[in-house]
Regions:
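NAD(P)-dependent Rossmann-like dehydrogenase/reductase catalytic/cofactor-binding core
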Residues: 75-139
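Polar low-complexity intrinsically disordered regions
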Residues: 1-2, 129
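Internal alpha-helical scaffold of NAD(P)-dependent oxidoreductase catalytic cores
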Residues: 3-37, 50-87
Length: 139
């Protein structure tokens, strides 16, 4: 959960709010100036992840897996990777390196993602959604 403190709120008010919200999920206090960036990342992010899961599933189907199996495997893979990032606190790049063998299948797949500019495309999507949020906020 995300919250911003009002102008008259004290630091203690912010800490209390964070503690209360943390009881039902992860809570972050951010400056109002960052709310559009939060929208670009977390507000629009689920759609990006759904599209990635769909593409991963499509790849599985192209490789011969039945659609239902491919979709479940793709979703479980994303869930497991996300849990590892959250539970270990390690940088995603470090976790990626831990599962990438020299000359193996994973590095071959990662090379294809780099050729397709996956990272740049995702970064640009977050930036575009952030800018759109700013424009919508201006009326």
């Amino acid at each position: 959960m995300l919250f911003r403190s009002g102008k008259s709120a004290t630091a203690a008010d912010g800490e209390l709010t964070k503690k209360l919200l943390s009881a039902v999920g992860v809570a972050f206090q951010v400056k109002e100036s960052l709310l559009d960036a939060v929208t670009g990342l977390s507000g629009s992010g689920p759609a990006y992840v759904y599209q990635f899961i769909e593409a991963l599933s499509d790849g599985g189907v192209a490789a011969g897996l039945p659609r239902d199996v491919a979709t479940k495997l793709a979703a479980q893979t994303v869930l497991g990777a996300a849990k590892m990032v959250l539970e270990t606190g390690q940088h995603p790049g470090a976790l990626k390196d831990q599962v990438t063998s020299p000359g193996g299948t994973t590095i071959e797949g990662l090379h294809e993602l780099e050729k397709g500019q996956l990272r740049a495309t995702v970064i640009n999507a977050v930036r575009a959604a952030t800018e759109k949020s700013k424009k919508l906020g201006q009326g």
